[in-house]
Amino acid sequence: MTEAATAQEITITRVLEAPRELVWKAWTEPDHLVRWWGTGARGWTLPPSAVTMEVTPGGTFRVTLTNDEDGTEMTTEGVYREVVEPERLVIDEPAEGAWHEGAVTELTLSDLGDGRTEMVVKTTIQTTDEMRRNAETGMAGSVDRLAEILESR
């Protein structure tokens, strides 16, 4: 029996030791994104040539991770629904060609002062419980990697 996809929510909150503008760049500039996106699980590579970002409302987002061991590719793509620099991004990820049946990711960055930023990433995704757990593990690993990079600057 195949498990039916249902609306699942994943929320990750982190306080980062970096100014909000730098965290914003980490999410919106390919040279920054390739250093942490999807690499938290290690064993995955995101080359700059595999990133397309048009960070404007209606602009597109596409990243293709490559598995270092077997060359398998995993693509995430979407459309920026909302862009409020340097505070908020909303990305709509349609189901076509994806491992899920549609998702919306909301990024909120709050300036805490003293060079610190609270980052909240909330993804609402149509998927199975098992795939949600896998997605949450991957997202948490990527966010941990982002925190490591920002704190080592």
Which stretches of residues belong to each language-model region?
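Hydrophobic ligand-binding cavity/cleft-lining segments
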Residues: 1-45
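A generic structural micro-feature
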Residues: 4-8, 53-55, 70-74, 98-101, ...
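Short beta-edge strand/loop motif at the mouth of beta-sheet-based domains
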Residues: 11, 31-73
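A short, structured loop/turn motif at beta-sheet edges
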Residues: 20, 55-56, 81-88, 108-118
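Hydrophobic pocket/interface hotspot
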Residues: 23, 33, 61, 80, ...
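Short amphipathic alpha-helical signal-transduction/dimerization elements
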Residues: 28, 143-151
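Beta-strand/loop substructures that line and gate deep hydrophobic ligand-binding cavities in soluble
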Residues: 90-140
